[in-house]
Amino acid sequence: MNDQTQFTERALTILTLAQKLASDHQHPQLQPIHILAAFIETPEDGSVPYLQNLIEKGRYDYDLFKKVVNRNLVRIPQQQPAPAEITPSYALGKVLQDAAKIQKQQKDSFIAQDHILFALFNDSSIQQIFKEAQVDIEAIKQQALELRGNTRIDSRGADTNTPLEYLSKYAIDMTEQARQGKLDPVIGREEEIRSTIRVLARRIKSNPCLIGEPGIGKTAIIEGVAQRIIDDDVPTILQGAKLFSLDLAALTAGAKYKGDFEERFKGVLKEIEESKTLIVLFIDEIHMLMGNGKDDAANILKPALSRGQLKVIGATTNNEYRSIVEKDGAFERRFQKIEVAEPSVRQTVAILRGLQPKYEIHHGVRILDSALVTAAQLAKRYLPYRRLPDSALDLVDISCAGVAVARDSKPEELDSKERQLQLIQVEIKALERDEDADSTTKDRLKLARQKEASLQEELEPLRQRYNEEKHGHEELTQAKKKLDELENKALDAERRYDTATAADLRYFAIPDIKKQIEKLEDQVAEEERRAGANSMIQNVVDSDTISETAARLTGIPVKKLSESENEKLIHMERDLSSEVVGQMDAIKAVSNAVRLSRSGLANPRQPASFLFLGLSGSGKTELAKKVAGFLFNDEDMMIRVDCSELSEKYAVSKLLGTTAGYVGYDEGGFLTNQLQYKPYSVLLFDEVEKAHPDVLTVMLQMLDDGRITSGQGKTIDCSNCIVIMTSNLGAEFINSQQGSKIQESTKNLVMGAVRQHFRPEFLNRISSIVIFNKLSRKAIHKIVDIRLKEIEERFEQNDKHYKLNLTQEAKDFLAKYGYSDDMGARPLNRLIQNEILNKLALRILKNEIKDKETVNVVLKKGKSRDENVPEEAEECLEVLPNHEATIGADTLGDDDNEDSMEIDDDLD
């Protein structure tokens, strides 16, 4: 064999591997086929074999070629025992001589792997193998010449398996992915794609930079550019170009020594500059290149950008561009900004429709068009902190995944019976092992076998039905995948002007598979129609599925809102008045505002806002809670701000977050953080008159435009809130009037007090100012019933099952002493606790009342312990025992305490 120093490292590796193959197969001589077999072995670094790269570039079947080579390799006679030394054959010597001649002709310093390959092509046995594998040698030669380009082999390490070694490692060829149909179709965004292409066609500074919020589709625009390049729908300067996406993670990974990262990056740039084909480099998150001083990759990029030797597309968000890229003026001016806006709901629906087949094929489900419309609408309404179309795509993807997982899992009916059968079979095995069994065991075994046979009989039709339904869906999915592959092949053939292949696919293969899909769809539809509600497999994603997904992600019962919202809103007053008693004017005002908003007649940018005025304990805060519970089925969907905590000037920062430079800047404010993730909420400002005037100033833009700006500069949308403010201003005028209904004169006095305290611009922005009535005796009786019902519900939540039964006299007692002019109905809760719950606790501990029993409460003569019951009343409530006490109680009473105190005084 020739001197080893004449070969490059890769060529020498191939020769060494060929010797090993000959030794492993016990062949006496090293022949050209061993060299060819070494070419198809995967290198130690895991890269694609050189010959595989050439064959696949020529669009030949590499797997078939590999089989032909291995088949010819095993046909060579073996020598037993294996030879001690393997000698090269005459044919191999001729190959190496030809390789040396080719090296000299190309004026290279070393024999490279392509020299050896070209020499192999001259061997008749190798030519026969290529012919058998249906691979054209001339086409492979042409691919090898394109791969080499103008590169000279002037060092032993200059050989490469790929034309663009650095780019193949640290970048992704997006044009190749588009050619193979691996990219999703880009719907819309024509203007942004055209703008990007216009900038790329410039003579200098041909570097667009896409700027927009995360999730609006910046990368999709680049995919659209790649698609247009392979379709030749670009200016002449870009025709035949390649678009690579730089993988910054791969570029950085493993660069442990100083200079490794820079060397890799410069290698990428050098390959782009030296390439005969125009290469456009896309750098996502381009602000990541900006670093510190000499280690900054942006500084390596600047010279190439300034000389116009490089076309780069950047993408970043508004915040990163402003805070990082703009600070380096020299880097920024080399790029032309292209603003990318968030698509509208209508545009998002169009995007979803374009991607619908991809998601149907991936998940094997059927997506209804109504599901796509619902996804776009719900994503816009309930996920405002995310951006379209990303949020809508997530809703569709999660819903499809949920349906696919449920489909691939066994139905509950089938799974339950199979588990029963498994348990019976285990029991049978255990009974069969008992050889000396008595008659009882034998009877049990007989019964178990009968039950097993019965379950098998029940399971057989269930399994058959399940397998038939599942097979139909799987077959349909496979047919759709096949259609997608054929469409991509047809497009590729049309691009290569391979009219024969394109015609065969367009007029024969594709119509056939479409007919098959139609037939399968009819079969599946017929099976679903026949099964009806008893279908074992659910394979459809509809609007309800999307609503359930949105409800899980947001915590808002979206499904219920969308189904029965109209009926709920019509009867809103009836439902709220059963919870909040005696305040019909306030309930009507809130109900009208909610109906106006939901029907789309209200100002979409202005939230419904209310100022509730009235006595303490009249139900202002309670109404806010019930509105949240009514709209969202959860009273926790209310954001409560106690304005008594906001009486200082600096309290504004509690709501909005501190400004830059202050401690806690990154944490944000209480109000802005809550509204960002709960945009559909009831926002309660309790006791708003106690807030500092600057807090009210901040609320002006929220009440007028439905937005507030956080300390970090983010605009928070408040347009979907219901803003409720409560105040006790003018309470003395309400308290002094006769009767429960607010009189016109009292209303004027209260409004006068309100105007004295709040500025006109604040009051003018409020949708409705409502004055709450004084609670009448009739209203107090209703409140008593509501509170007792709430206590029973609280028992259930604590896993206690007591039923309260109060006599009418006992309820009258609670209504009489549970209300005061100063505190409204607030004393009622304390009265119930002192007169009923405390006494009930003692009865329970003494086992006089047990779980799931009725608690009887009566009025009796005696002294009450509640401060709201005057001493001269001489009446209180008594909880009657249902059983005799099993635990003795302390007999020392209140009277005994007082007597003992008097004795102590006498002794003193």
UniProtKB/Swiss-Prot annotation:
It is found in: Cytoplasm; Nucleus. Residues 892-908 have a biased composition (Acidic residues). GO terms for cellular component: cytoplasm; cytosol; nuclear periphery; nucleus; TRC complex. Changing residue 765 to M: Can oligomerize in the absence of nucleotides. Residues 4-150 form the Clp R domain. Inhibited by micromolar concentrations of guanidinium chloride. Inhibits the ATPase activity, but does not dissociate the hexameric protein. The modification N-acetylmethionine is found at residue 1. Changing residue 184 to A/D/F/N/L/Q/S: Confers resistance to prion-curing by guanidine. Changing residue 728 to A: Almost completely abolishes ATP hydrolysis at NBD2, but does not affect nucleotide binding, thus keeping NBD2 in an ATP-bound state. Reduces stimulation of ATP hydrolysis upon substrate binding. Disulfide bonds: none annotated. Belongs to the ClpA/ClpB family. Homohexamer, forming a ring with a central pore. The hexamer is stabilized by high protein concentrations and by ADP or ATP. Oligomerization influences ATP hydrolysis activity at NBD2. Interacts with YDJ1. Interacts (via C-terminal DDLD tetrapeptide) with CNS1, CPR7 and STI1 (via TPR repeats); under respiratory growth conditions. This is Heat shock protein 104. It comes from Saccharomyces cerevisiae (strain ATCC 204508 / S288c) (Baker's yeast). The gene is HSP104.
